[in-house]
C-alpha cells in the first residue's frame, strides 16, 4: 500500500474511510468521473478512532502467510480488503464494521464451464448485520411498502418482514479492526446457497481462486472448481455498494410503453383500486445546461467495447450503440451515449476491468452458443439503472447452427396455460417433442414438465426454459418472499417473474439471427449471387486467419453489408435492453413486404426490440430491401421520449399511442390471442410472410443436390440443408397457426386519440386463410418436395468423435416418415388444442350473429375433409402396393387424426369451457367418418393391400369407440 494511504489510515481510521467509500454511488458514467461521483463530498464525515473488538481473536495476514489483493492501478482503496494464501485456494476478506447496515448488491454468475457462461444467474440486494460471531446478509422487503400513517407502517413491519439470504461466520478481527470472513467457504463450498442444483456434484476439494479484485465500489471474486462430470467451471460473484439519495426522480410506468419496471405494493392506501406502484427502469440522464434546447449530457452513459471483440466487427458494434443517440437528441440531450474502444495493441483503456462496476462493457465470448444479452443492475427502490453490460457470443456469426434444434424454442410460443397443461398430460401430441431430435426428447420432456410445475407453483405462466424464480437456496420464489432472488439467464422468464425489479435476464434475439445466418451460408449462391463463399461445415477450407476476410468486401465468407448489418441490429436490440426497454413483438407490423423491399431500403420494422428474421425478398417487392434493422425505429424514438423526457407532463407523449409504428406487445402478449404479437414474423400481414417463406423453401429445395453440395463435399451437407429448409417451413406453419381463433389486442386507454377497441376478433377470412395454409403446407404430400433421388442423398457425417457422435447415432437414411409425421402432428395440434378452440368459441360470442365468424364445427369439418380426401371422394385409377391409393404419409396422418378425435370424444381429455362442444362434435366427426369408410371400402374393393388394410383397421377402431360399452384407455 502506498505510504500516503498508510499515513491517512493511521490518522483517521480504516472504518470511517470504508464508510466514505461505501456511501459513494456505484457507477461512474464517463472516463473522467470514475474516481469522483455526486455525493462523495456529502459522505465525508469525521472518522472515529480505530478500535478492535476484544471478543474476537486477532488475525495477522503476514503470520498466516496471506498476500493482500491489490487491484487498482491508481492506488484507490477497494470496497474492502482481501488476502489470498500462497496456494491460491483460501480467500479472506476484512469487512469494515461500518458495513453493518450498508446497502449492497450481490450478483452471481456461472462465468465458465457452462454453454451460456457469462449470463447473469441471480442477484441480491441487502446489507450485512452482525449477530454475535456471525454476519447475516439481510434482504429488505422492497415489494411491500406503505406511504400511509404510522399504524400502517407498524402493521407492515409485523407481517412483511425482511429475510436472511445467507450467513457466514466472523473468524477474527482484521488488521484494521474489521471482521474477517472466509470468502472461499462462503462462495465456494457454500455455492449451492446461490446456484442450487446447478452446482450439485461440484468438487470443492479442488477449488482454486480464479479472480479476486477489489475496486472502490465493488469487489469481484471468481472461484474455479470441477463441476459435476469433472469439467472445470468458475463461479463469479460481484459485491458492490448501492447509491442512496442522489437526486434521481422515479418515473411511473404506463402499460402503453414498454419498459422493465420496479414494482411494489403500497398497503398504506386502501382506497386505491390498484395498490401496485410501478416505476420504469431508466438511467439518470440530464442536460449539462438545462437552458439549452440541445445540451450535452451532464453524465453520459459510457460503453467500452472489450478488446476481445474482433476488429472486423468493431465498427458495427460501435454504430449499434451510438444509434440510440438519435432518440436522446429528440429530448434535448446531445451525446447521451459515448463509446470507447479498449485495445490491447495500443493499450487504450486496458486499465479498465470489465468486471469493475464503474464501467459498462460490451463483452465478447466464443462459446458457439450464438446468444446476446444486455442485462443491467437497477436500484430496487427507485428503478434507476446503475450499470449495464452487453454479452455477445461470436457463435451468432460463426457457428453453423442446427436450425432444427431451435424449433422447440419457436413452436408453441402462443400456447395458452391450459394448452401447456394439456400437452403435459398428453405428451404424444406435443409438437415440441415430436419435432425434437429423438436423442433429446426425453430430456426435453422433463424440462417442459418442470417448466410447467414451476409456473404452477409460482402462479405464473412459463416463458422460458425455467420460468419461475428461485431463491439463492434453490427454493421456488414468489413475488413477496423472494422479491429480488430470481434465477436469471437460461430459464428465467427473462428476469421478469418473481422479482420486484425486472431486468433482461435472457434474450433470444441473437440466437434467432444465428439460424438465419446458417441458412445464408448454405444459400449464399441464391441470396448474394456468389458461389462457394464458404464451404459450410468443411472446416479445412476456412481461412486460417479469423480476422482476414475471404475476399474484399466480405467477412466470415459473407458480404460485410450483410453480416455487419445483422451485428449492428443485435447490438441495437441489446443496448435497448440496457436502457430499460422491453421487447416489442408488434414492431414487425410496420409495413408490408412490398413496401420495404424497394431500392430505397426503408426500415423493415418500427423497433429494434422485436425478434426479426432476416428479410429475404422472394418476389415480394421490386428490389431486395434491408436485411434487418439499419437504425432505431419510430417506436424506439417514442418510448425513449416517454422515459427520458425532461418534461413532467407526459400525457401528450402517451396520446400518440395509436400513431403508426407505436403498437406495443411484449413477452406476456406472445401467449395471448393477438397473432401480431409474435416472435420471428415479418410484415404488416404475417400470412404474406408465411407464403413468402414457403416460396423461399420451395425454390431452394430443388437446388440441394446440384448447388448446396459441391464436388468433394460430404452428402451430410444435403441433409443439413434439407432439415434447415424444413425448419423454415415449420416456422411458417407456426406463424399461420396463431391466426386461428385470434383476436387483435390493443393497449390504448379509454379516450386516447384514434381509440380502438381493446379486443377485436381477427377477420374470419384471415382465419380461414390460415387454416388452409396449414392444410396445404403440412397435410399434403406435395408440400415436402420429396423425391427418391433426394432421399437417397440425405446422409450423415461419419466421424467417430465428439463433433460427429450425434450423426453417428442417427440413422444413415433420413427418417422421412418420422419427420413428416412430426410436422403433420404440429399442424394438428395447432388446430386441435384447448387454447385455439376456446378462442374460436370466444370469437363466436364476440361477433354479432348477423356477421361472419369462423366456428368450431366449420374448423373441424374443413380439417376432416383435408385429412380424409381419398375417403370422401375416392380417386379413380389402377392402384397397386407400389402405387397405393393412399400414400404412407397420408395413412400416418389419418391414424394420427383418428387417435386424437377418439380421445377428444371422451370427457376429461380436453380442458376449457369448449370441452363439451368439442366432445360432441368429435363424436359427430367419427360417426360421419364411419359412413365414409363404408362407402370407400364398398366402391374400391380392388384397392391396394396397404389402403384396404388401413381403412379396415380405422373402421374397426372407430366403430368400437362409438360403442357405448367401449372402455377407453389412454
PLM segments and residue spans:
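Bacterial N-terminal signal peptides
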Residues: 11-24
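Short pre-active-site segment immediately N-terminal to the catalytic Zn-binding motif
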Residues: 309-313, 553-571
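Extracytoplasmic/secreted envelope proteins and their assembly/folding machinery
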Residues: 318-321, 325, 564, 568, ...
